[in-house]
UniProtKB/Swiss-Prot annotation:
UniProt protein name: Endoribonuclease YbeY
Family, as annotated: Belongs to the endoribonuclease YbeY family.
Organism, scientific name: Methylocella silvestris (strain DSM 15510 / CIP 108128 / LMG 27833 / NCIMB 13906 / BL2)
Localization (cell): Cytoplasm
Highest taxon above the source species: Bacteria
Pfam families noted in UniProt: YbeY (PF02130)
SUPFAM superfamilies with a match to the protein in the record: Metalloproteases ('zincins'), catalytic domain
Keywords: Cytoplasm, Endonuclease, Hydrolase, Metal-binding, Nuclease, Ribosome biogenesis, rRNA processing, Zinc
C-alpha cells in the first residue's frame, strides 16, 4: 500500500534539494513494509519542507518550545487502518543541514531519517518511554539500512531528543 504524499516546499533553501517526492515515497514505502502497518486504502500524508522560522513558530504554538527543531509530526489521531488522512510531517532546512554537517552525514540521508521518524509518529510510534524509543530506533535503523543509509544513531544528534515528539493539534497553517 502506497499512500498519497502531498509535498509543500515553504522555503527557498529546499528548491535545490533533488526530488523530495521520490525520496519521501521511497522512505515511506520502506517504513510501511518494515513496520507492517496496515493503512486505509486511500491513506494520505503531507510533508512540508520549511525553514527554521516556520518550524519555530509551530514548535512554539504546539509544544511551547521557543526554538526551531529538525522535524515535527502532527498525527491525525484516528486509527490508521480506517483514517485516510494520517497527518503532517514538517522538516526544517537549516536545523537539518546543521545536524547533518555536525554528524558528518549526507544531508539527503538525514532527511530520509527524519521522514522515516516523522512517519512512524504518524502511524502511532513514539519515544517517550525508553522501551518505545528503543523499538522505534531499531525500526528506523532497519528501514534506513534497507535503503543503504548508515545507522543514524551512531552519534547522537542534539535535536533528536528535543524535537521529534508527535504534536497534538491540527496543522492548519500549511493546509491553505
Amino acid at each position: 500500500m502506497k499512500p498519497v504524499i502531498d509535498i509543500a516546499v515553504e522555503a527557498e533553501a529546499w528548491e535545490s534539494f533533488e526530488d523530495p517526492a521520490t525520496l519521501a515515497e521511497t522512505v515511506i514505502v520502506q517504513t510501511i513494509s518494515q513496520s507492517g502497518a496496515k493503512l486505509a486504502a486511500e491513506a494520505e500524508i503531507s510533508i512540508v519542507f520549511c525553514d527554521d522560522a516556520f518550524i519555530a513558530d509551530l514548535n512554539r504554538k504546539w509544544r511551547g518550545v521557543d526554538k526551531p527543531t529538525n522535524v515535527l509530526s502532527f498525527p491525525s489521531g484516528g486509527p490508521i487502518a480506517v483514517t485516510p488522512v494520517l497527518g503532517d510531517i514538517v522538516i526544517a532546512y537549516e536545523t537539518t543541514e546543521r545536524e547533518a554537517q555536525e554528524a558528518g552525514k549526507p544531508f539527503r540521508d538525514h532527511v530520509a531519517h527524519l521522514i522515516a521518524h516523522g512517519f512512524l509518529h504518524l502511524i502511532g510510534y513514539d519515544h517517550l518511554a525508553a522501551a518505545d524509543a528503543e523499538a522505534m530506533e531499531a525500526l528506523e535503523r532497519s528501514v534506513l539500512a534497507r535503503l543503504g543509509i548508515d545507522d543514524p544513531y551512531q552519534e547522537p544528534l542534539a535535536s533528536v531528543e528535543d524535537g521529534l515528539a508527535p504534536v497534538k493539534g491540527p496543522l492548519t497553517s500549511v493546509k491553505e
